[in-house]
Amino acid sequence: MNTRLACVFLFCLIAPLAAAEKPNIVVIMTDDQGWGDLSVNGNTNLSTPHLDSLARDGVSFERFYVSPVCSPTRAEFLTGRYHPRCGVHATSNGGERMNADEQTIADVFKTAGYATALFGKWHSGTQVPYHPNARGFEEFYGFCSGHWGDYYSPQLEHNGQPVKGEGFMIDDFTRRATDFMNRQKGTGKPFFLCLSYNSPHSPMQVPDQWWEKFANKEITL
């Protein structure tokens, strides 16, 4: 009985969406950022006004489950399933790879007629069939490994081809994502964009303006 009610409820939610115009969707993911790494959650050592605004004016999930490490969390986001079911059990030595037959959120949007793109960190496999271009993302600019040793103009890739990054990686990924959205404006095609930042993961490099802002700041507990 509960299953039937759940299905009816789901149908009532989905039916209006099917008839509505397809919205553009942007997902922004940060790396190794904890719940307490936001000023909106009481951290007085940081200043995160834009994220605070999203939390105050949008929807905030305050009771949720997420894996404490990288690749398992990414697998769960990409598939909507617990990471062991996807074949992901670690962050290296092949344990970061989702099963090749898993359907990703990008696959679903691509099938629905969306342009799909990922800019930034992947960490779910480096080669086909694990590469983002083989997992539903038509456009990929970034890196596939777990982290990068230098955040300034490093070696990256664009749709499988090696390229050199342009400046601070976070800014580079943001520019590329913005360019993608601007290109999509005149196409009449909706887009699904994942902007996957590698920060604040170590080595925790930042532009001088942000370093200088906090260089001599005392940490309060």
Label the predicted regions.
Residues 2, 17-221:
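Formylglycine-dependent sulfatase
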